[in-house]
Amino acid sequence: MKDVRALLLAAGLGTRLRPLTRSCPKCLITIGGRPLLEHWLCALYRNGITQALVNIHHHRTLVESFLARNQFQGWVYGVYEPQLLGTAGTLRQNREFFENEPVLLIHADNWCQCDFSEFLGFHSHQRPSGTSITMMTFRTSSPTACGIVEVDSKGVVQNFHEKIEDPPGNLANGAVYLLEPEVSAWIGERLFVKDFSTQVIPHFLGRIATWENQGIHRDIGMIHSLVAAQSDPQPVNCWDTADSWSRAFESHPVHHQLVGELD
């Protein structure tokens, strides 16, 4: 898929992972010895995404230091939010970066392994006509803790239920989306739109295609799910793990705390 640009939402506070996130942002929590954000950027790199924006808020200095590594220069850019803008607000604030191109919008605090080439290809060539968004979905064993979608025979979202007590199924929103430029334009024209799940998705019901991830998809917002992720098969790393940033991080008290908590 040509010209798609990525926005990785990585600025969250990670309150459910405290005390880990008191000294480390959630996006730098390690899985298989590598920061979560590095896993995401590796997936983009492998699939030819050459422009990516990462929003930053919590533990700004640590994230900016991570993004200053050589392998991210010229294609990954951090943007600091003194006050969090909301999942849709960040997209609106940075619309110029996307230059009227499709946007790969990623909630980068989840642990995801999938065939991104298939996801990108589905959006480009196979999504039903009349749709402007492709939502990655997955089957969850905890539907009350997820946003659950109802789809028609073509896989188009007809209804969406955000963390309700008795959801109608287990097909969950994976919080990874491909957006056509008209979606970004709609958000950009409406300053009151801050949240993607509660404001954008309801407006575009009937125009959201779905692609089901058959691989791994976890919300690692709780310690037990983060521990479970350590046992998942790990993808091959894209870059040298012995660079100066990695060596510094491994010697940092934050890293030792993470290792101690996850052992």
Feature locations, PLM:
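Conserved catalytic-core motifs of eukaryotic protein kinase domains, centered on the activation segment
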Residues: 19-22
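Short, well-ordered beta-strand micro-motif
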Residues: 30, 137, 150, 178-180, ...
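Catalytic-core segments of class I nucleotidyltransferases/pyrophosphorylases
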Residues: 102-104, 111, 117-125, 141, ...
